[in-house]
Amino acid sequence: MTRPPAAAATVRRAVDAAGCAPVRDLVVAHARHERSDVAVPADWAEGVVGLIAAGRLDLFVAVVDGEAVGYASVTTDVATWSAAPYAHLDCLFVAQGRRDLGVGRLLVRAVVDHVRARGLGELQWQTPAWNEDAIRFYRRLGAQGRRKERFTWALAPGR
């Protein structure tokens, strides 16, 4: 199988169910790749469309020959120390077999252009410490790593 060149990939924003639905399989693969036990709900696209409509999430999809091969999602957060908003790259994923084609760079470029257009001056994200390929990719982009442990706490209703 011949791999298409990066120029064959396009990136678009997903804003409705039709645009978001093909991304669900990528989200499942991403969670598996990161060794997560999070279950991606069957109605994932509906939830994401609601977040997009509320202005809480932006979703970018990389497409090659009509197939979704990667995605990036961005939210806006605030940094208390600097008293400034920043963009948070919640997810960046390119399907196995579609990596090393420039798709990740295209997704990051779309995110950066979007973030700059919104007037935000910083993009932050995290990746598992064991994901050396991603760390190398981010460093090649010019990003700087900052060590920190990430925690999650599943809160039961009413607690």
Question: Which stretches of residues belong to each language-model region?
Answer:
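Conserved beta-strand in the GNAT
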Residues: V61, E67-T76, H88, F93
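A short, polar/charged loop-to-alpha-helix boundary motif
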Residues: A79-P85
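Conserved GNAT acetyl-CoA-binding A-motif
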Residues: R116-T127
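Conserved acetyl-CoA-binding loop-helix of GNAT-fold acetyltransferases
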Residues: V94, D100-D113, R136-R140
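Residue-level recognition of the GNAT/N-acetyltransferase active site
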Residues: A95, P128, A156
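A short beta-loop-alpha structural element at the N-terminal edge
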Residues: A9-D25
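A short helix-loop-beta-strand connector motif used in the catalytic cores of GNAT acetyltransferases and
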Residues: V49-V61, H88
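Conserved GNAT-fold acetyl-CoA-binding loop/helix
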Residues: A17, D25-V49
